């Protein structure tokens, strides 16, 4: 698909972590264009029901349900991080995309591989930048577009 003769591609961000004693570490993050795979593997938890005078209603205040919702959110973020970083060709030791029980270990694994907390946070920022448009990026793109129009 094209918009105004421009082919649409996924957003990509690159993070280069310098290493003095070896090659620099390059992380490439791309936008996750669909969460269908995640939803198929990890459907949203359903609240247990309670019987009221008005009938059967979901009990969203149930402590067990709230824990499941929190875990679901953690897995969702982990999935986005892992899928976004696929172009980096990371050879995970414990994390596998096929096993959602391993997903939340991604940050622990980056740290145990030797990244500092700050570097791991930069990886997260890179992933978030690839998956979101902030106002600064939109303004920069708009200004560039308008400058091109003014020069015509």
Please give the residue ranges for each predicted region.
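Short, surface-exposed, charged amphipathic helix/loop patches that serve as local interaction elements
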Residues: 23-152
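Short acidic-hydrophobic surface loop/beta-edge motif
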Residues: 10-22
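Extended acidic low-complexity intrinsically disordered regions
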Residues: 1-12
